[in-house]
């Protein structure tokens, strides 16, 4: 984003994640002089997020459900959003925003793409098909990141095994 302040777009599927889970972090970025934008599907927590001084941009097709057509639309929405905003950083959170947002950010030539793994969708007890799908999606999206952050040692170890 052109201007004097660096800009960061945080991407989640739901506005409640932006407001309740990431709210203090977003406020800290804003207090440090960043232009902070939250991007998610619209919902009832947008007003509370904006009351924190965080701009919200709706991504209508970014939902938790797995719908390939809606997911492609969400990826296009994210690409257009990043092209229009020209942020310095895109930071994705959770599996689906990471799978869609990291490639979209790289395609839009965002200078820094960061992802936080808040947990992996596939567990050892899940079927082989699901575990393989998650691994392929995560590895592909991680190739689009400049930095990958994890919140627990189990996910760090799993991702290291996956390569």
Where is each model-derived feature located?
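A short, active-site helix/loop in glycosyltransferases that binds the activated sugar's phosphate group
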Residues: 47, 143-163
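Short His-centered aromatic/hydrophobic patch
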Residues: 92-98, 117
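Conserved nucleotide-sugar phosphate-binding/catalytic loop shared by glycosyltransferases and other
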Residues: 31-73
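Short beta-strand scaffold positions
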Residues: 40, 91-92, 149-151
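N-terminal subdomain of nucleotide-sugar transferases
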Residues: 1-41, 55
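Active-site proximal beta-strand in glycosyltransferases
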Residues: 7-12, 89, 106-120, 138, ...
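Nucleotide-sugar donor phosphate/pyrophosphate-binding loop at the beta->alpha transition
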Residues: 19-22, 69-76, 111-114, 121-144
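An amphipathic, basic-hydrophobic alpha-helix
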Residues: 60-89, 99-107, 132-140
